[in-house]
């Protein structure tokens, strides 16, 4: 009965129609004990599927609130019980395991201490959970791994944005969509939804806010922004807040590590930490899992939502910014505390040592009690103690441990393990540096395609991972592809494909054609099949060469192929000062002011290599150019011509743009490649299958007798059959 009434009860908690919605997803029933998140989430999805948007919002929000409340209970109970003297672990167990001293009173003593402390800690945690969650609440509200993963991926917000949209709450719909997208930047449907929200009149730029941003990231970004404006005094409170928030976030993560053993991931079971044998093996196995999880909290705290990798040296770098900012405003004592804390991580850091000497000289007489920060000292001592135990288990029990910290002293690692760890690191060279291309003299002799020559390498292009190759297309092949682009543009009114003004400049017209669209037009008889087939063949030709040159030991996959033409608009070229395509990088958002490139949306972060295969040169302007990360200093310039390929890595090392096309029409095949097979271009596969089907049908028709029907099927009907066969109407994907 209670489960049937839950949607109605939660519906009453929603604000009345027309009332202002509070910013963010605030608590629906403050002070109330959390309910079972899994039941709330399941009920919310049922309401969503039934189109009951208001109950769906209430249930999904309450599921989020309850999940967060459970996390706070674990954190609070863990902290209070850890502070209980009667439940403290024996001091002898907090450091490295000592060699067995043999049977006797000493061994029995620590065993009794351990078990007594474990029992008291368990009793304390049970009583605390009962007070906060009710009797048996910890077991009743336990969440399975599948649901934890769904909440970590922020899936409730995917449903919330749709429900809010149906309720006409566009501000919250955009916020929920943005919150989901931040953690799932590769979600193509949400990328399209975000673009739609941006075009809606009722949505403001402020609507796109992350409702789940960890507080330490918000403070960190604000502090960096203020430092960039030379406002150290205003930045200091935000930087300190970021550091304290980072430490608090790690404590929350560590509390989650102490859940039931079944909640630990399968990763630990594979590395030998799973429970085997008797009592002590079981205790050791679970304890190792907890320690491994705690050590991973450093990387999780340093990883932005939606990012794959943590910010390197996150805590030490925060301390570096703090001591520099304190010094700028004259807080020398605090500057010394923070620089001494940096030296706890890196005792031989020359820059930190120079800064310390400078601060001490400016301060004058040494002040008693001035040392590293106590919170950082506690963090390092605890982390080193855990590492010591994990390396011991690695050496003696055969478990594995991936140390997340570059500052771990080498002396802490057992000598027997150092060589093995060094070998493991050397087995994966691409994790540390890109594959180096072969020298120019090698490529002049062994290029894969006859007639292809390497014209310029990275050295001649004044950069890294760049190359210009000529001869990939014959003049006849360039003509076929140019005709394909022209025919597709001419068929725009019938197919939904039409040119438009360039999104980068009002002085040019932009036309784009994907491989799938070309295949569909060829199947419909709108364009010739020769051009569509050549488009597929040439894209694979470019992929093969790019992989052979830049990544011979790691397969590359096409992620997107686009035939693009830019045409100068007559009468709009006088005194033109803009570019055809502004300077950018292909897999990160370039910040010319700082020279940094953020690998995050809206950039296509999975792109690893880019290629531009030119089809003509009978136009004015339109040269490709590379720059420094400041987007101002030009380092190389490439003039398009038929069959010329410019290939380069897609990151910050290769910012590039296109000079204005001031006369004529410039056409090129743009291709992007990825190491990630899950991001390979599915439309390329569909296009290939579609063209193969067309060829088979043509061959069958040739074998049959000529039909007496004087009225063959019109192209529009044939086009409709293509749509039906693929299961959906063909769509044009625009990508610049």
From Swiss-Prot:
A motif (Prevents secretion from ER) lies at residues 733-736. Pfam families: 2OG-FeII_Oxy_3 (PF13640), TPR_leprecan (PF23557). Its EC number is 1.14.11.7. Detected in fetal cartilage (at protein level). Weak expression in heart, lung, ovary and skeletal muscle. GO terms for biological process: collagen biosynthetic process; collagen metabolic process; negative regulation of cell population proliferation; peptidyl-lysine hydroxylation. Residues 253-275, 689-736 are annotated as: Disordered. It is an enzyme of class 1 (oxidoreductase). Residues 561-675 form the Fe2OG dioxygenase domain. TPR repeats lie at residues 37-70, 154-187, 216-249, 316-349. InterPro entries: Leprecan_dom, Oxoglu/Fe-dep_dioxygenase_dom, P3H, Pro_4_hyd_alph, Pro_4_hyd_alph_FE2OG_OXY, TPR-like_helical_dom_sf. The active site is at residue 666. Residues 721-736 have a biased composition (Basic and acidic residues). The keyword Iron applies. Glycans are attached at residues 331, 462. Its cofactor is Fe cation; L-ascorbate. Residues 1-20 form the signal peptide. It is found in: Endoplasmic reticulum. GO terms for molecular function: iron ion binding; L-ascorbic acid binding; procollagen-proline 3-dioxygenase activity. Part of a complex composed of PLOD1, P3H3 and P3H4 that catalyzes hydroxylation of lysine residues in collagen alpha chains and is required for normal assembly and cross-linkling of collagen fibrils. Required for normal hydroxylation of lysine residues in type I collagen chains in skin, bone, tendon, aorta and cornea. Required for normal skin stability via its role in hydroxylation of lysine residues in collagen alpha chains and in collagen fibril assembly. Belongs to the leprecan family. This is Prolyl 3-hydroxylase 3.
């Amino acid at each position: 009965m209670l489960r049937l009434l839950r949607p109605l009860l939660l519906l009453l908690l929603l604000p009345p129609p027309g009332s202002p919605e509070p910013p963010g997803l605030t608590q629906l029933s403050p002070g109330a004990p959390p309910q079972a998140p899994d039941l709330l989430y399941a009920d919310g999805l049922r309401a969503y599927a039934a189109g009951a948007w208001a109950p769906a919002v209430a249930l999904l929000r309450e599921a989020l609130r309850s999940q967060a409340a459970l996390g706070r209970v674990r954190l609070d109970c863990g902290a209070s019980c850890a502070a209980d003297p009667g439940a403290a672990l024996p001091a002898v167990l907090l450091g490295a395991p000592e060699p067995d001293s043999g049977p006797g009173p000493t061994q029995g003593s620590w065993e009794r201490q351990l078990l007594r402390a474990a029992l008291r800690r368990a009793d304390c945690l049970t009583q605390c959970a009962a007070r906060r969650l009710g009797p048996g609440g910890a077991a009743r509200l336990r969440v399975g791994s599948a649901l934890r993963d769904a909440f970590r991926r922020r899936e409730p917000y995917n449903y919330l944005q749709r429900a809010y949209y149906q309720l006409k709450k566009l501000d919250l719909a955009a916020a929920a969509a943005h919150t989901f997208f931040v953690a799932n930047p590769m979600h193509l449907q949400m990328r399209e939804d975000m673009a739609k929200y941006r075009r809606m009149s009722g949505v403001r730029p402020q609507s796109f806010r992350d409702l789940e941003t960890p507080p330490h990231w918000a403070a960190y970004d604000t502090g960096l922004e203020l430092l960039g404006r030379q406002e150290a005094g205003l930045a200091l409170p935000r930087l300190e807040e970021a550091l304290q928030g980072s430490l608090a976030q790690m404590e929350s993560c560590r509390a989650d590590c102490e859940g039931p053993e079944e909640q630990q991931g399968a990763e630990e079971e594979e590395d030998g930490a799973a429970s085997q044998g008797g009592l002590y093996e079981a205790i050791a196995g679970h304890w190792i899992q907890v320690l491994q999880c705690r050590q991973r909290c450093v990387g999780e705290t340093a990883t932005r939502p939606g990012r794959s990798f943590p910010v390197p040296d996150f805590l030490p770098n925060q301390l570096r910014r703090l001591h520099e900012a304190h010094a700028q405003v004259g807080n020398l004592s605090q500057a010394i505390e923070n620089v001494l804390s940096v030296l706890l991580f890196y005792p031989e850091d020359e820059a930190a040592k120079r800064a310390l000497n400078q601060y001490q000289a400016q301060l004058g007489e040494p002040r008693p009690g001035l040392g590293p920060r106590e919170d950082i000292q506690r963090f390092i001592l605890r982390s080193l103690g855990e590492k010591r135990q994990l390396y011991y288990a690695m050496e003696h029990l055969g478990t594995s441990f991936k140390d997340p910290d570059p500052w771990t002293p080498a002396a802490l690692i057992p000598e027997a393990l150092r060589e093995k760890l060094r070998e493991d690191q050397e087995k994966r060279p691409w994790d540390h540096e890109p594959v180096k291309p072969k020298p120019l003299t090698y490529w002049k002799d062994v290029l894969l395609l006859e007639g292809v020559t390497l014209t310029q390498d990275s050295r001649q292009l004044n950069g890294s991972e760049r190359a210009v190759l000529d001869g990939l297309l014959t003049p006849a092949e360039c003509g076929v592809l140019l005709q394909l682009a022209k025919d597709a543009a001419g068929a725009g009114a019938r197919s939904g494909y039409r040119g438009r003004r360039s999104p980068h400049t009002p002085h040019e017209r932009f036309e784009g054609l994907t491989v799938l669209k070309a295949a569909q037009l060829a199947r419909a008889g709108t364009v010739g099949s020769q051009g569509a087939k050549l488009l597929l063949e040439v894209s694979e030709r470019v992929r093969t060469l790019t992989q052979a040159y830049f990544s011979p030991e790691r397969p590359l996959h096409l992620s997107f192929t686009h035939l693009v033409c830019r045409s100068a608009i007559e009468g709009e070229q006088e005194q033109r000062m803009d570019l055809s395509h502004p300077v950018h990088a292909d897999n990160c958002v370039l910040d010319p002011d700082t020279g940094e490139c953020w690998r995050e949306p809206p950039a296509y972060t999975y792109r690893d290599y880019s290629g531009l295969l030119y089809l003509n040169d009978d136009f004015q302007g339109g040269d490709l150019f590379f720059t420094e990360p400041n987007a101002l200093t030009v380092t190389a310039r490439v003039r398009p011509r038929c069959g010329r390929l410019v290939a380069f890595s897609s990151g910050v090392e290769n910012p590039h743009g296109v000079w204005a096309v001031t006369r004529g029409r410039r056409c090129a095949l743009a291709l992007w490649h990825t190491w990630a097979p899950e991001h390979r271009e599915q439309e390329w596969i569909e296009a290939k299958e579609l063209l193969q089907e067309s060829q088979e049908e043509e061959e069958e028709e040739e074998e049959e007798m000529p039909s007496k029907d004087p009225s063959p099927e019109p192209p529009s009907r044939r086009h409709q059959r293509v749509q039906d066969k693929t299961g959906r109407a063909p769509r044009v994907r625009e990508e610049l």
